[in-house]
Amino acid sequence: MGATATGLGVTYWQAMFAEFLGTFFLMMVVMGVAVDKKAEPGFAGISIGMTVAAVIAVLGAFTGASINPARTFGPYLMDMVLGGQNLWAYFPIYLVGPILGAICAAFAYAYLAKDSGVCELPQPFNDE
């Protein structure tokens, strides 16, 4: 119960790509409204929440719209512990797709916003 699974007729690679895209869009919004120092305060919560709702509405029937490996890991683990259906063969869809989507979005946002003067991303710690 609550475990994510692909829809009928959705291939392994289609599902992984869908999870990639969903997480990519979510991460782009997070970067733009929550991480970017020049983002207008007060809109991050509603923007991120509406993006999650939109991704779920679009991807729900195809992949269950996990967009977070932990969202899939917990139900899969409990299914295994409680003797339910074994869905671990699908786990790479929900691990690789979202992680690659988030990484690509972070780099894409940094690249697209760096020269526009709009973006000021936090810098890593420098111990010098």
Please place each PLM-identified region on the residue numbering.
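Membrane-interface helix-loop junctions and terminal tails of multi-pass membrane proteins
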Residues: 1-128
